[in-house]
Amino acid sequence: MAKAKGNREKIKLVSSANTGHFYTTEKNKRNMPEKMEIKKFDPVIRQHVMYKEAKIK
């Protein structure tokens, strides 16, 4: 039997400091339909900055 497709989708979190740094993660699109924004560490500038969701190409 085929397994049901899950609700989790892979996303990319891109730094708002325009350093080109990004994290990849998953989110449940049913529980969190809006775009994710989270404060994380950017090792390029060595500061905590906002990361915004983008699609993985």
Swiss-Prot record:
<dbReference type="GO" id="GO:0003735">
    <property type="term" value="F:structural constituent of ribosome"/>
</dbReference>
<dbReference type="InterPro" id="IPR038584">
    <property type="entry name" value="Ribosomal_bL33_sf"/>
</dbReference>
<dbReference type="InterPro" id="IPR011332">
    <property type="entry name" value="Ribosomal_zn-bd"/>
</dbReference>
<dbReference type="Pfam" id="PF00471">
    <property type="entry name" value="Ribosomal_L33"/>
</dbReference>
<dbReference type="GO" id="GO:0022625">
    <property type="term" value="C:cytosolic large ribosomal subunit"/>
</dbReference>
<dbReference type="GO" id="GO:0006412">
    <property type="term" value="P:translation"/>
</dbReference>
<keyword id="KW-0687">Ribonucleoprotein</keyword>
<protein>
    <recommendedName>
        <fullName>Large ribosomal subunit protein bL33</fullName>
    </recommendedName>
</protein>
<dbReference type="InterPro" id="IPR001705">
    <property type="entry name" value="Ribosomal_bL33"/>
</dbReference>
<dbReference type="InterPro" id="IPR018264">
    <property type="entry name" value="Ribosomal_bL33_CS"/>
</dbReference>
<comment type="similarity">
    <text>Belongs to the bacterial ribosomal protein bL33 family.</text>
</comment>
<keyword id="KW-0689">Ribosomal protein</keyword>
